[in-house]
Design a protein with these regions (language model features):
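N-terminal secretory signal peptides that target proteins for export/translocation
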Residues: 1-17
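Sequence context surrounding c-type heme c attachment/ligation sites in exported
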Residues: 2, 31-161, 165-203
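Bacterial N-terminal signal peptides
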Residues: 21-32
C-alpha cells in the first residue's frame, strides 16, 4: 500500500493572481507549480474530520455547485463486524471530461473518533489505497486509469471490510472532482457527501 503524508494545498492563491493585472504574466508559471493529481490526490482531502476537500486546489467554483451530484451506495443500514461490503461511488456533472474521488472510513465518535474504521480495498485497476503516515488513516481514491468516465459519469467500486468488533458508528466521507481535463486546477467542480453507518445490534 502506498504511504503518503497529507500533501500541500495549492501554493498559489489563484483568485488573488487574477485580481491583479500586473500578476497575469505569472499565471503560466503558477499553474505549472500547481499539482493536478491525475494519479490520485494527497491523503486527507475528503472534507471529513476537519480535513480540506479537493477545493484546496480546484477552487474557482463553489463546493457542491448545482448541476452535479456525488453519491455513495452499497453501505448497509447497520454493519456486521468483519463483514465485507461493496461500495459504489458515482459522480455526475454535465460536460465533465474526467473525474476523480477520495473516500475514507473512520469511527464517527467516541474515544476512537477519526481513527481508521475497518479496511478499504480497490476492486479493479481504477482505484488505489493510500495511507497517511501522520494520521494512520487509509484512503481509497482514483488512479490515472480511474479518471476515465464510465458513460457520462465517474464511477468506482471499492470494498470496505467492517471493523472486527462493533466499536461504534462509522463515518464515510467522500470528495469527488468533476474535471474538464485541461491540466490545470481551473474549471473543475468539487462535490462532497457523507454517510454514517451504525453497528448491528448485539444479539
Amino acid at each position: 500500500m502506498p504511504t503518503r503524508s497529507a500533501g500541500p494545498s495549492c501554493p498559489i492563491p489563484l483568485r488573488r493572481l487574477f485580481r491583479r493585472p500586473a500578476a497575469l504574466a505569472l499565471v503560466g508559471a503558477s499553474l505549472a507549480a500547481v499539482p493536478i493529481f491525475k494519479t490520485g490526490p494527497p491523503p486527507g482531502h475528503t472534507g471529513g474530520f476537519g480535513e480540506p476537500t479537493c477545493r484546496a486546489c480546484h477552487s474557482d467554483a463553489g463546493l457542491n455547485e448545482p448541476g452535479g451530484e456525488l453519491t455513495v451506495s452499497g453501505a448497509p443500514a447497520r454493519y456486521e463486524p468483519g463483514q465485507t461490503y461493496q461500495l459504489e461511488v458515482v459522480l455526475r456533472r454535465a460536460g465533465m471530461l474526467k473525474a476523480g474521488f477520495q473516500l475514507a472510513a473512520r469511527f464517527a465518535d467516541g474515544p476512537a473518533a477519526g481513527a481508521q474504521a475497518g479496511a478499504l480495498a480497490p476492486t479493479d485497476a481504477r482505484s488505489i489505497v493510500t495511507w497517511d503516515t501522520l494520521t494512520h488513516v487509509s484512503y481509497v481514491e482514483h488512479n490515472l486509469a480511474g479518471t476515465a468516465l464510465t458513460g457520462d459519469a465517474g464511477h468506482w467500486i471499492v470494498r470496505w471490510t467492517a471493523p472486527a468488533t462493533a466499536t461504534g458508528a462509522v463515518a464515510f466521507n467522500v470528495a469527488g472532482n468533476a474535471a474538464n481535463d485541461d491540466d490545470s486546477p481551473l474549471g473543475d467542480f468539487i462535490y462532497t457527501t457523507a454517510l454514517r453507518v451504525a453497528p448491528a445490534a448485539r444479539r
